């Protein structure tokens, strides 16, 4: 943001955070949008490494431009391989259930939707159109259901 580096932006940053305090309460908000703007970040590798500490999901997508800039895009379209991300998260969820953890659910925030249809007639903050967010949520839910049936 404004040319300033992010405080947490790599797998090693997340690993350092979870190692500082060995408690399930020391958790992560996993944002695919923020992490996907660095082409070197491998989101599935981050999930495999620190997934046991992910408590909240912010699933969104970006398109990277040749000059290093990016813009937000649809939830399942863009540089994030949302299929592989959701699959890794579902595997983590099944692992938690098997262990008997009470925090197996990871709530998802489906904002940053694409403005569409009647959204153009509604007042909303950028990235928060009603129908666009519902479309994104339904795409993610369908993806989740399809992957669950293969696990």
Region roles according to the model:
Residues 1-151:
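Histidine-acidic metal/acid-base catalytic patches
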